[in-house]
């Protein structure tokens, strides 16, 4: 799995666990909905760390908690 897919999956997982929409996530993260949708729908292939941090802040989790999944542990190498 590549990094952007893991990020997308994690955002969707966290929203599902909290039963919140993408628009609600945008509101609580102080981001425009388009920023999150661009990540989820593949328009943004390299989301900024600050954007992910803002999502984490909105969800009241740390960056460590965001990235602490098997998907991130098993990422394929980006440099080939």
Segments the model singles out, each with a brief description of its role:
Residues 25-26:
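Short alpha-helical "recognition helix" segments of helix-turn-helix
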Residues 57-68:
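Intrinsically disordered, low-complexity basic tails/linkers immediately adjacent to helix-turn-helix/homeobox/MYB/SANT
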């Amino acid at each position: 799995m590549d990094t952007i897919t893991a990020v997308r999956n994690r955002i969707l997982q966290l929203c599902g666990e909290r039963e919140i929409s993408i628009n609600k996530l945008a509101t609580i993260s102080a981001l425009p909905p388009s920023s999150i949708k661009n990540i989820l729908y593949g328009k943004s292939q390299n989301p900024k760390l600050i954007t992910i941090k803002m999502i984490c802040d909105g969800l009241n989790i740390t960056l460590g908690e965001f990235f602490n999944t098997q998907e991130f542990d098993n990422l394929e190498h980006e440099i080939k």
